[in-house]
Amino acid sequence: MTTKTAPTQKSAGMMEGQPHLKQRSREIQTFQQIRSLPLGLSEQAVGQSVTMLNQILADSITLYDLYKKQHWQIAGPTFYQLHLLLDTHAEEVEGSIDLIAERIQMRGGVTCGMPFDVAEKTKIERPPMGVESVSAMLARTVNAHATVIRTIREGIELTEHNKDYGTNDLLMSGLLRMHEMQVWMISQHLVDTPLIDEGNGRKGE
């Protein structure tokens, strides 16, 4: 004759449905590891794409933060125009960040997403905590774009060679054209042209 084991009673005062808030886990995929997906690409090609994309991701996050810093700190006669322009550019860069991160995950990689990891990885020069002149702010922004563009162009050549056409399309259509447009828009504010042409004024006035 078999006997049934009585169900274990819960400890007095224990509530069901309580979230387990102190859970921790070992890494199930390290930053260096890449999941194998049926993409029709070699392991080397995927690894090179992920490494390149993570560099662009870190630099893009840094560029976004730089834009927001300058959006808040900008001052002077062109404050309103630049305040809006810098925020518009920041939103565009923010949109590109999600595209880059998702592309890394699509390739089986791990995104570089935490601020301290981004700070270690970015190639963009760190700005001062304080406020720079408007021209210095804008020149710094153009140089930050140049850093990102350099890696994007290298990535375009790399992905073309490796036949990673999906990533190649993102780099060219989704990123390069946006950065080139933003460089043009910002750099035009660095042209040394006075707001008023004093040479056209009438003498004696």
Model-derived features with residue positions:
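Acidic, low-complexity proline/glycine-rich segments
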Residues: 6-39
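Disorder-to-helix initiation segments
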Residues: 34-56, 134
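Helix-loop segments that flank and shape redox-cofactor active sites
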Residues: 40-48, 63-88, 151-167
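A structural signal for well-ordered alpha-helices, especially hydrophobic packing surfaces
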Residues: 57, 64, 71, 90, ...
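Conserved alpha-helical segments that form or flank metal/cofactor-binding pockets of metalloenzymes
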Residues: 68, 74-117
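Short, contiguous alpha-helical
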Residues: 95, 169-201
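Acidic/histidine-rich alpha-helical segments that form the ligand environment
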Residues: 102, 116-174
